[in-house]
Regions:
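ATP-dependent adenylation/nucleotidyltransferase module used to activate substrates
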Residues: 1-112
Length: 112
């Protein structure tokens, strides 16, 4: 059975970020360039402003095969003065769900 509280998602997220900025000296938000992580980064910016902790550190691990609009969104977010972006491109072995012949692929493969 579900148990509801008298708070909405925004209020709960705000409380959590206030706790984070009160109890931790270093904060870094993981950013995937999706809409959920975009909301999370904006919530972190709001909290950092309240706690005088700007800019927000954000980490984006580039998987190489991304849509142009997703990359454009990352550029927009990381060009904001409230954000210090860490854009990382590493050769990482990943599962490949789109091929039966190549079950894994290596993003940022220097040999290709």
């Amino acid at each position: 059975m579900k148990h509801y509280i008298d708070k909405n998602v925004y209020e709960s997220a705000t409380e959590r970020f206030d706790y984070i900025y009160t109890h931790f000296d270093k904060v870094c938000v993981s950013f995937s360039n999706g809409k959920d992580s975009g909301v999370l980064l904006n919530l972190a910016i709001e909290a950092a402003k309240r706690h005088n902790r700007l800019p927000v550190n954000a980490l984006y691990i580039d998987m190489e095969a991304q849509y142009k609009h997703a990359i454009d969104f990352t550029y927009r977010m990381f060009s904001r003065p409230e954000v210090t972006g860490w854009w990382v491109c590493l050769p990482i072995h990943l599962r490949n769900a789109v091929s039966q012949f190549q079950p894994h692929w290596l993003c940022w493969d220097q040999e290709k």
